[in-house]
């Protein structure tokens, strides 16, 4: 039986900044640029009380909380702290799959310190993170990645949730389907139309029926309903593509997606820089409200030189794909491919 830990730092970017400005800890703070089309990179917990959240356009955020405090992001600082945290992980296992600067899966089926349980490993990691960085982390411990990720969010912030193998079916019985990765507003609406509210409800539905309604994702839903996730924790390796996508709570017209394009482009470019890689290809992806997928890509003889160039290529791809302005979209994504090491001698890891 595998033992998986999902570590998720609590409001990471905001928490790093608030270490240096403790007088702001009780105030609504967001990490964002002052660009007119900027979106929130992170929101402190007091800011979340107002409904502020990551990826929210700043215009909307200011309406919800006129007195919010904006701090410009400092990714060099966040990478440095991430590296500290990654060093802690490596003291316990070498099987680490970073998802972002503040989130990772760890396979501790066998841990390096011979601690008696995965729970003990998670407790020690969280304690070390606090002692060395003054930041809190939430952790989920479970037999697979799907459950570990859900568990890490269960007692946030600064929480620990453990799902033991014999507790899996009881845990997922009343688990709302909206908690499942990949279940956005549209999928949730379709599930509700079928009178399906929890994973327990899904357990009574045949796999073929779910596939009929949800395509390939129906098979994944069926497995999740049985508490099954065969995915392994993937230790870092050279990636063939770096991409990010987001599913909207409500379908948007194309012109309403502009701030999200900028946010995704910045995240993808930042990930490229973190990996010390360069890219010669750009791709985009959109899914409309009818689940029709549009994709377009373009490659070049030389590597992209800047974030601005990346954004310019994205704008060109959007023009070439000839989308209808009266259509609405539920998902957008951007990516970089044809990756190779950059000219820099030093190879940085994501953490």
Swiss-Prot record:
It comes from Acinetobacter baylyi (strain ATCC 33305 / BD413 / ADP1). One of its GO terms (molecular function) is magnesium ion binding. Monomer. Mg(2+) binds at residues 8, 102. Keywords: Cytoplasm, DNA damage, DNA repair, DNA replication, DNA-binding, DNA-directed DNA polymerase, Magnesium, Metal-binding, Mutator protein, Nucleotidyltransferase, Transferase. Poorly processive, error-prone DNA polymerase involved in untargeted mutagenesis. Copies undamaged DNA at stalled replication forks, which arise in vivo from mismatched or misaligned primer ends. These misaligned primers can be extended by PolIV. Exhibits no 3'-5' exonuclease (proofreading) activity. May be involved in translesional synthesis, in conjunction with the beta clamp from PolIII. Its cofactor is Mg(2+). Residues 4-184 form the UmuC domain. CDD domains: PolY_Pol_IV_kappa. The keyword Transmembrane does not apply. Binds 2 magnesium ions per subunit. Its EC number is 2.7.7.7. GO terms for biological process: DNA-templated DNA replication; error-prone translesion synthesis; SOS response. InterPro entries: DNA/RNA_pol_sf, DNA_pol_Y-fam_lit_finger_sf, DNA_pol_Y-fam_little_finger, DNA_polymerase-Y, DNApol_IV, IMS_HHH_1, Rev_trsase/Diguanyl_cyclase, UmuC. This is DNA polymerase IV. It holds the Pfam family IMS. The keyword Magnesium applies. The record marks 13 as: Substrate discrimination. It is found in: Cytoplasm. Belongs to the DNA polymerase type-Y family. The active site is at 103. GO terms for cellular component: cytosol.
């Amino acid at each position: 039986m595998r033992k998986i830990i999902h570590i998720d730092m609590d409001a990471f970017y905001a928490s790093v900044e608030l270490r240096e400005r403790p007088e702001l800890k009780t105030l609504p703070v967001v990490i964002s640029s002052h660009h007119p089309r900027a979106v929130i990179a992170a929101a402190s917990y007091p800011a979340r009380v107002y409904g502020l959240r990551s990826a929210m356009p700043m215009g909307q955020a200011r309406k919800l909380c006129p007195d919010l405090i904006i701090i410009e992001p400092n990714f060099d600082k966040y990478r440095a702290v991430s590296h500290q945290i990654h060093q802690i992980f490596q003291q316990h296992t070498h099987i680490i799959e970073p998802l972002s600067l503040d989130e990772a899966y760890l396979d501790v089926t066998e841990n390096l310190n011979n601690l008696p349980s995965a729970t003990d490993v998670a407790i020690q990691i969280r304690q070390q993170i606090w002692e060395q960085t003054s930041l809190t982390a939430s952790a989920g411990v479970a037999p697979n990645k799907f459950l570990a990720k859900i568990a890490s969010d269960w007692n946030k912030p600064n929480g620990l949730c453990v799902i033991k193998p014999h507790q899996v079916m009881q845990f997922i019985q009343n688990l709302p389907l909206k908690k499942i990765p990949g279940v956005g507003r549209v999928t949730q609406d379709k599930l509700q139309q079928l009178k399906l509210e929890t994973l327990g409800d899904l357990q009574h539905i045949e796999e073929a029926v779910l596939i009929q309604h949800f395509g390939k994702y129906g098979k994944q839903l069926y497995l999740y309903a049985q508490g099954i996730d065969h995915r392994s924790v993937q230790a870092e390796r050279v990636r063939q593509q770096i991409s990010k996508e987001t599913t909207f709570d409500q379908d948007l017209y194309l012109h309403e997606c502009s701030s999200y394009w900028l946010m995704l482009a910045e995240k993808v470019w930042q990930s490229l820089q973190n990996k010390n890689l360069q890219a010669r290809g750009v791709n985009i992806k959109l899914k409309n409200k009818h689940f029709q997928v549009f994709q377009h890509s373009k490659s070049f003889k030389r590597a992209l030189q800047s974030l601005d160039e990346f954004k310019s290529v994205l704008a060109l791809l959007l023009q070439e794909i000839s989308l209808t302005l009266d259509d609405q979209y539920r998902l957008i994504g951007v990516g970089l491919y044809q990756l190779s090491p950059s000219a820099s001698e030093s190879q940085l890891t994501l953490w």
